[in-house]
Amino acid sequence: MQDLELAWSKTVSLGSLGDIAGAIAKSLLEYAAATSGPFCLWLQGGLGAGKTTFTGSLLRALGLGDSIPVTSPTYTYMNEYHIPSGLAAGWYAHLDLYRAAAGLDVGELGVFDARPFRGLIVEWPEMLADPESLAPTHILRIDMAAGGSSRTYELKVRRF
């Protein structure tokens, strides 16, 4: 497999999160159209970096309705979201593995048993025994570093 390649790095205020999420949503949809496969977006950053907040913005940019709450699945490990229509129509999984035991097997989560997902958004992927098992076709990593009222977003892409 190829190493991750830096696509871009931006530091923005929290008010610009929608713009960042929109740009990444466009990239994910272009990938899905080109490959007919799901994407897997890894979110990395410390506690409070804004991973779940970003996930909500990304799902909204993909077309999730404002009335549907996007919450952290810290205790349930996975939340599912359905976008009923549009270019991004389909099911999406948001995983938060922070409380998982180190070395968790992806099969234990039942991610691939639940339904065919158009995309997977994964917080704390390093908790998996085989992190690559959640990325059969594509990985996007975003490293977010807290910096007061702004965040630094570094997008890395791996295509294989």
Predicted features by range, described:
Residues 40-42:
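Short hydrophobic/aromatic beta-strand immediately N-terminal to the Walker A/P-loop
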Residues 44-46:
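P-loop (Walker A) phosphate-binding loop of NTP-binding proteins
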Residues 1-3, 102-160:
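Short phosphate-coordinating micro-motif centered on Lys-Gly-acidic
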Residues 1-19:
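Charged, amphipathic alpha-helical linker segments immediately N-terminal to NTP-binding catalytic cores
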Residues 51:
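Conserved lysine of the Walker
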Residues 27-38:
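Phosphate-binding P-loop
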Residues 64-81:
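Short beta-strand-centered segment that lines the nucleotide-binding/catalytic pocket of NTP-utilizing
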